[in-house]
């Protein structure tokens, strides 16, 4: 019997009553019989953004298989048609091999293409929404396959219209890419490459540097970690909390609670809606949660390389992960009156 601990990058979670792997087409054929009253159905990708309860899951978990990516001309763009089960990083690597560099800043992000669309991934100045063509979705309420455009996805920070929605399943989608190099739009990446912002660099240069940055933070899947880098922090869901957005008034109160000058441009950023995005990692550190912190006797800990990652040090349970995450959210809330929102999807759990 398959368990969530076997199919998630965090490596926690109980047994699954029924586990199915199938292609998107096979899923559409079988779906009406799966989505029946009283039966729980969960469709997963790479399990890199999922935390499941230790209790047995009584329903069906479906993992969609990948299929070949189809590349075709579409006017000024080249259209990549991709199945939901395709590894995101494999897609990045494949697009680079074909001379399309736009996805290179998002190298090394674990999980699948379907998860990337639902999660609205972005990294180092690039975002999946900026190149989205369409999303193919199975609607369990109507048993039909429908197409979502960019507006239909209602993208927000690390969220979309399809995140945490169990009756709509992403089957695949299209990205519209242009060949050639892409400008470096993120300060940390520019500094690492030793170039000015806006400089055009080859996708391979960008990819190599992004993978190195992620390895230094312990934010790469184990199979992508370059030789010589630590792999002890790879059992995680990446960043466990999203960076909170606060009002400018709240930011003024926050300044009085932290050391003078601490709220600099490296930890705050103006949001496109007029709020201020604050580094969640900064809030954890200012609340006393240092890298490597753990509750006594627990195998769940904060990564020794990145303050925002909760890692499984070996044999951790979902209960231990939630215990640590709960302690963090309560402490940050008491100290700064800021509620941290978890980034991963919870199954049978809540903070």
From Swiss-Prot:
Compartments it resides in: Cytoplasm
Any one Gene Ontology cellular component term annotated for this protein: cytosol
Occurrences of domain FAD-binding PCMH-type (ranges): 11-213
Catalytic residues identified in the record: 158, 239, 343
Pfam families from the UniProt entry: FAD_binding_4, MurB_C
Keyword Repeat: no
The EC number(s) this enzyme carries: 1.3.1.98
Gene3D superfamilies the record matches: 3.30.465.10, UDP-N-acetylenolpyruvoylglucosamine reductase, C-terminal domain (3.90.78.10), Uridine Diphospho-n-acetylenolpyruvylglucosamine Reductase, domain 2 (3.30.43.10)
GO molecular function: FAD binding; UDP-N-acetylmuramate dehydrogenase activity
Family matches, as PROSITE patterns: FAD_PCMH (PS51387)
Reaction equation(s) it catalyzes: UDP-N-acetyl-alpha-D-muramate + NADP(+) = UDP-N-acetyl-3-O-(1-carboxyvinyl)-alpha-D-glucosamine + NADPH + H(+)
UniProt KW Protein biosynthesis keyword: no
Matching HAMAP family: MurB
Protein function: Cell wall formation.
Entry's family note: Belongs to the MurB family.
Protein's UniProt name: UDP-N-acetylenolpyruvoylglucosamine reductase
Record lineage: Bacteria, Bacillati, Actinomycetota, Actinomycetes, Micrococcales
